[in-house]
Amino acid sequence: MTTPANPRLPIHAAHGTELTARSWQTEAPLRMLMNNLDPENAERPEDLVVYGGTGRAARSWEAYDALVRTLTTLGDDETMLVQSGKPVGVMRTHEWAPRVLIANSNLVGDWANWEEFRRLEDLGLTMYGQMTAGSWIYIGTQGILQGTFETFAAVADKRFGGTLAGTITVTAGLGGMGGAQPLAVTMNDGVVICVECDPERIRRRIDHRYLDVEAPSLEAAVALAVEARDERRPLSIGLLGNAAEVLPRILETEVPVDIVTDQTSAHDPLYYLPVGVPFEEWAARREADPEGFTKEARASMAAHVRAMVELQDRGAEVFDYGNSIRDEARKGGYDRAFEFPGFVPAYIRPLFCEGKGPFRWAALSGDPADIAATDRAILELFPANERLRKWITMAGERVHFQGLPARICWLGYGERHLAGLRFNEMVASGELKAPIVIGRDHLDCGSVASPYRETEGMLDGSDAIADWAVLNALVNTASGASWVSFHHGGGVGIGRSLHAGQVCVADGTDLAAQKIERVLTNDPGMGVIRHVDAGYDRAAEVARERGVRIPMSEG
């Protein structure tokens, strides 16, 4: 018996200026919810899965219908409450309150593990929201691209004289997050071999111009990589295979590998393909015996990470890109799993101390010309930032839009609100055809507690203190964000993180300008405060220089 076709599919966000909802403040979350499920963005839209294994935009199709229905009728003095992808209430609030408040995947500590989460998910009581899937601000692979670009640029600065030209990177995973890796490396002038077990993902990354070529074998991939490296020519190479098998083989070839990382879905062992399991049998095998499958996956991750550590022993720069593969490998029996660092303490924390982090926006008009106009505005606002200029220029030339046209760049405390206010002015003046939504990843300087990623190795040992993520959600709600979310388990998996997100709508009104100024000042301000409190001197300098009040420093 065949499953009947879902009449809702395919889903595309509306373009243009005609409203379905009662105002732009509610039209925006409606369009962004739909944009998350656009087939250009979503990995499995038929299952409401956007990215990251099982990261969903809504809990069920019935819940999706109720979300759409409620957003179209919601007033500007009302707030919709969303509990793990399902609308559970509408409250009368006020125009400064968020139109949507979202809580996804949150569990009490002793119950915060994958087994209990899956039991509750099977009962229809929760869903996995990842970071931007359940908070409706996913913009495709570009959403992680600049962060990945910045990370590889930091690697280049640290080890390779400011460029990756003449280097070879080996990594794995070309999904919604990992798919940014090949372009991020080539934007830094390097060569990269990307291992992926799903042929469709390789094809998609080539179609979207994130990946240059596919090699038919490891030997062919190595030959292409060495040739490009010797010519100091950027090149990204996709290789169909299982990383737990390919990386040990790379060790045997003794190819001089310079950089190693990974972005497979290791955060959830059911979405890491074990050695010996055919790709075609993956789904059936994990559903038939999740406990046994998890054990096999962890054993394969142990082999994968062992190869990474041995490449580090040979001199490669190796780092965890925030998917918990080290912890899973340790559970799989490999004791040296944590001998290489996570990317945040290794490269990104100095940026966090300045309140820098991912600042993204999408054009509700659907017109790429609106993004081109905002690109120009960003360059005019920050003419002295050479790395930003390089990024915006290359992104305009090379980044494929997925769904609504969007852009991302990293901005710091004292910068984000200037960009938001400029965009709002451009909407008001008619320079932009429709409003802009402004949000970010939950991976930010002051919005997450994640001891295996963003808060790994904090100076004061506060890696697991989650108060900061809660305060971030509260301050963004108090400051006037259009929608605010608080999630558990994004990026690194259930039991390992708590994190918050916010989105503002620049609709050209004076009220929007007031909200934007507060939110886009206070949100990155939380990053400065969090790092001052942890004892980082640079954060304390930024606080003094830019007027961030720290009561414990005022006595």
UniProtKB/Swiss-Prot annotation:
Enzyme class, UniProt record, top EC level: lyase
Pathway(s) per entry: Amino-acid degradation; L-histidine degradation into L-glutamate; N-formimidoyl-L-glutamate from L-histidine: step 2/3
Cofactor names: NAD(+)
Any one biological process term the GO annotation gives: L-histidine catabolic process to glutamate and formate
Gene3D superfamilies documented for this protein: Urocanase like domains, Urocanase superfamily
Organism per entry: Nocardioides sp. (strain ATCC BAA-499 / JS614)
Lineage: superkingdom: Bacteria
Bound cofactor: record note: Binds 1 NAD(+) per subunit.
GO molecular function: urocanate hydratase activity
Annotated function: Catalyzes the conversion of urocanate to 4-imidazolone-5-propionate.
Subcellular localization, as worded in the UniProt entry: Cytoplasm
Keyword Cell membrane included in the entry's annotation: no
Record-level GO cellular component terms: cytoplasm
Catalytic activity: 4-imidazolone-5-propanoate = trans-urocanate + H2O
The protein, known as: Urocanate hydratase
